[in-house]
């Protein structure tokens, strides 16, 4: 049994600095085809991928994201929940399918489909020697992204992905993940608070030491402190409104 794929995914880390080398059309096609091979719920294929190489569009999206690598990359992918095709089928159907694709379950199916496709693309890109970084920051202004990309109803931008050749060999490193015993529950969920607190304390120490070493002492925050800062910042509170404007979560 080969550990090639295991070792590949274990090395994953976000890359935020890329060489100024655009991906070829052949590479883009292969990445998309790899993404399409991902599992999809009930064969709905409730997603689409928008490829961006137009510099003006990239710049407009950078203004939403606030991140330079939205522009400075080899290629930019945008992943969307897409029920527009299903809506067109619905126009000639005898049943009202919108009850399904306009539901909360429909949202989950589309989001999961898009994520599975994107992960396939990410792993394939890394196998080719490229680096990637996911871009949830495009949800900072969903309405503006929908305008930039001319998205119809029943299509919702979930996240993006910048891909390209890493600018150097030291362009990031894999962060220590939560230990195996923290995330793997055998047969049932184990919610004992004392055990959870002890595990988090150990992990907080690991993360603090990681940042301390990586930044020569400039950062020492724990994982818990990061979570408090991120989840305590009440951002993107308009998601439900934006989803409903797109024709999703109507029930």
UniProtKB/Swiss-Prot annotation:
Cysteine-cysteine disulfides: none
InterPro entries to which the protein is assigned, alphabetical: Flavin_OxRdtase_Frp (IPR016446), Nitroreductase (IPR029479), Nitroreductase-like (IPR000415)
Pfam families membership: Nitroreductase (PF00881)
Keyword entries, A-Z: Flavoprotein, FMN, NADP, Oxidoreductase
Enzyme Commission number(s) of this protein: 1.6.-.-
Gene3D superfamilies in alphabetical order: NADH Oxidase
Highest taxon, organism lineage: Bacteria
Transmembrane segments annotated in the record for this chain: none
GO molecular function: oxidoreductase activity
Cofactor section: FMN
UniProt function note: Reduces FMN, organic nitro compounds and disulfide DTNB. Involved in maintenance of the cellular redox state and the disulfide stress response.
Family according to the record: Belongs to the flavin oxidoreductase frp family.
Protein name: NADPH-dependent oxidoreductase
Lineage: Bacteria, Bacillati, Bacillota, Bacilli, Bacillales
Recorded name of the encoding gene: nfrA
């Amino acid at each position: 049994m080969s550990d090639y794929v295991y070792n590949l995914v274990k090395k994953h880390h976000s890359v935020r600095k890329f060489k100024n080398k655009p991906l070829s059309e052949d590479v883009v096609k292969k990445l998309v085809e790899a993404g399409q091979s991902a599992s999809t719920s009930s064969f709905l294929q409730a997603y689409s991928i928008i490829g961006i190489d137009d510099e003006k569009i990239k710049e407009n999206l950078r203004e939403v994201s606030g991140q330079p690598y939205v522009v400075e990359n080899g290629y930019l992918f945008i992943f969307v929940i897409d029920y527009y095709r299903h809506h067109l089928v619905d126009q000639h159907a005898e049943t009202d399918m919108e009850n399904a694709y306009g539901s909360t379950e429909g949202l989950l199916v589309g989001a999961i489909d898009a994520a599975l496709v994107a992960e396939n693309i990410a792993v394939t890109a890394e196998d080719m020697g490229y680096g990637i970084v996911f871009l949830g920051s495009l949800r900072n202004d969903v309405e503006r992204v929908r305008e930039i990309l001319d998205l119809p109803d029943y299509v919702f931008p979930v996240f993006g992905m910048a891909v390209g050749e890493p600018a150097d060999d030291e362009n990031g490193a894999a962060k220590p993940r939560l230990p195996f015993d923290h995330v793997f529950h055998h047969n049932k969920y184990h919610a004992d608070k004392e055990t959870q607190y002890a595990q988090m304390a150990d992990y907080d120490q690991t993360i603090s030491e990681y940042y301390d070493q990586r930044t020569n002492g400039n950062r020492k925050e724990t994982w818990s402190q990061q979570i408090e800062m991120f989840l305590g910042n009440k951002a993107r509170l308009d998601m439900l409104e934006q989803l409903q404007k797109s024709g999703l979560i109507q029930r």
